[in-house]
Amino acid sequence: MNSTFRTLAEPNRLRVVELLREGPLTVGEIANRLGLSQPQASKHLRALSAAGLVEVQAIANRRICKLRPLPLLELEVWLESFRHSWDEKLDRLGNYMQEL
């Protein structure tokens, strides 16, 4: 999970993940939508792929990129534990405020 956070801490990589949430894209499409050169987009995709967040498949002369759900599901489970804790604390605070 640490590598996921480290990888997503770079703003362009987070933007790539947000784009791929809509569905698979080619490297060129990602570069165009983010205003990056293809080498820059490829560099970010290599980092995302190394972290297990993105899968890149070569089809003819195109590289199709798509999200890999498992690392994102692990983050969701981890965040859910915080959400549950905060919900309980906010409920107690709400009850306390009503008693006042």
Regions inferred by a protein language model and the residue ranges of each:
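Absolute protein N-terminus
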Residues: 1-2, 100
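N-terminal helix-turn-helix DNA-binding core of bacterial DNA-binding proteins
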Residues: 2-39, 62-73
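Short amphipathic alpha-helical/adjacent loop interface patches that line ligand
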Residues: 24, 34, 38, 45, ...
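Alpha-helical residues within the helix-turn-helix
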Residues: 32, 43, 49-50
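Beta-hairpin "wing" of winged helix-turn-helix
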Residues: 50-60, 64-66
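Amphipathic alpha-helical dimerization/coiled-coil segments
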Residues: 73-100
